[in-house]
Amino acid sequence: MKQEIQKGDVATLSFEQALKQLEVIVENLERGDVPLEQSIDIYERGEALKKHCEKLLKAAEAKVEKIQLSEGGTPEGVEPLDSE
């Protein structure tokens, strides 16, 4: 089933909205029945959506903190989550 790709500013989308649009784009491109010019347009939108999702994930990751425990096992503070 061919799904419509929404237009509009990617920056205003939530992570979930952007991810859903990205999934629709992938489905449409994988089917292979999209004309070349439209494929290029939706591929470019997909790239913008991917970057937006990565930006939102990075921001969420920065908010997550790791609890520091003392030698006795009691919480004594927090530190940023290590990026690996």
Curated annotation (Swiss-Prot):
Q: What class of enzyme is it?
A: hydrolase
Subcellular location, principal: cytoplasm
Q: Where in the cell is it found?
A: Cytoplasm
Q: Reaction(s) catalyzed by this protein?
A: Exonucleolytic cleavage in either 5'- to 3'- or 3'- to 5'-direction to yield nucleoside 5'-phosphates
GO molecular function term, any single one: exodeoxyribonuclease VII activity
Q: Which keywords appear in this protein's UniProt record, sorted alphabetically?
A: Cytoplasm, Exonuclease, Hydrolase, Nuclease
SUPFAM superfamilies per record: XseB-like
Gene3D superfamilies the UniProt entry points to: Exonuclease VII, small subunit
What is one process in the GO biological process aspect for this record? DNA catabolic process
This enzyme's EC code(s)? 3.1.11.6
GO annotations of cellular component type: cytosol; exodeoxyribonuclease VII complex
Pfam families recorded: Exonuc_VII_S (PF02609)
At the top level, the lineage of the source is Bacteria
Give the family per the record.
Belongs to the XseB family.
Q: How does it assemble?
A: Heterooligomer composed of large and small subunits.
Job of this protein: Bidirectionally degrades single-stranded DNA into large acid-insoluble oligonucleotides, which are then degraded further into small acid-soluble oligonucleotides.
Q: What is this protein called?
A: Exodeoxyribonuclease 7 small subunit
Organism whose genome encodes this protein: Bartonella henselae (strain ATCC 49882 / DSM 28221 / CCUG 30454 / Houston 1) (Rochalimaea henselae)
